[in-house]
């Protein structure tokens, strides 16, 4: 395990948005080899981005889909994402035998729809994952 920018100094080493254009350091580290996967979070740790072993960023849009696929393999159930997210979550949910619901944009709307449908996971396409087993809020850490 290799950490970058892990000391809470108050100074951020780059623009804190977990977008590929801001993450050259982690991309370069991954391209050097020796690591299988990289997890990147924003300063308040409510969004997660991932990098593959070759330094390719696994887009934020697919973070929720990837985590949901794993969760649904172990805890079958329903999912929710906002209307501006990829259809991939719907497809994965159906493949795993659950029901997918779309919510209006905004964490509060996603959470309300999750409670209404008893979803086991939900979130937004910007890397925000909501895992009710932990709590009803976007949180990157349970996704890792």
Q: How should each PLM-predicted stretch be described?
A:
Residues 1-143:
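Phosphate-binding chemistry for phosphorylated carbohydrates and sugar-nucleotides
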């Amino acid at each position: 395990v290799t950490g970058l920018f892990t000391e809470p100094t108050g100074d951020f080493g780059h623009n804190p948005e977990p977008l590929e254009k801001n993450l050259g350091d982690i991309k370069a580290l991954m391209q050097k080899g020796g690591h299988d996967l990289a997890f990147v979070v924003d300063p308040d740790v409510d969004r997660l981005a991932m990098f593959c072993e070759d330094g390719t960023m696994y887009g934020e849009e697919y973070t929720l889909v990837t985590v949901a696929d794993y969760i649904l393999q172990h805890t079958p159930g329903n999912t929710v994402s906002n209307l501006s997210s990829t259809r991939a979550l719907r497809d994965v949910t159906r493949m795993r035998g659950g029901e997918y619901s779309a919510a209006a944009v905004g964490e509060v709307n996603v959470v309300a729809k999750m409670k209404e449908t008893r979803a086991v996971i939900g979130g937004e396409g910007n890397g925000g994952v909501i895992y009710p087993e932990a709590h009803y809020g976007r949180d990157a850490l349970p996704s890792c």
